[in-house]
Amino acid sequence: MKKTRKIVTATVFALYIFLLIHVLFFRYGRSAAAGIDGLSYRLKYAANFVPFKTIRSYAAAMHRIPRVAVLNVIGNLALFAPMGILLPAAVPAMRRPMRTLLFIFVLIVAVECVQLLLGLGSFDVDDIILNFTGCAVCCAIYFSVTSRKNDKA
């Protein structure tokens, strides 16, 4: 039974990673905006380095475009949330909460940087905040549940 659970967990984790890569880099037929000119443009006009700027703009726009605002915030909260459960469940080296959270934080920042450098999406510090928050909540739930199981055993 334990081996079956490991196989299922690893399979679900692999599928999640595949879907995550697709959503982050290949949805909507994205293509890289090449060259330094593209990067300088993205840095100047398409990147947000100010924490909560995008979140505040969505909050301000709730009465005009509620669907876009809600979908963006909830989508960013949910995007990395499964990672908070699947990573420690599938990878024994990630069975410590701080190690898991640090790894995922670095991963999220790296994803945003790749999006900026390649022009596959945009860099937004609020995406980092929301992605990490969703992940941290699920990570806390995972470690809370698994520590209770270990206490009972």
Model-identified regions with their sequence ranges:
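Bulky hydrophobic segments
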Residues: M1-L120, V125, C139-A153
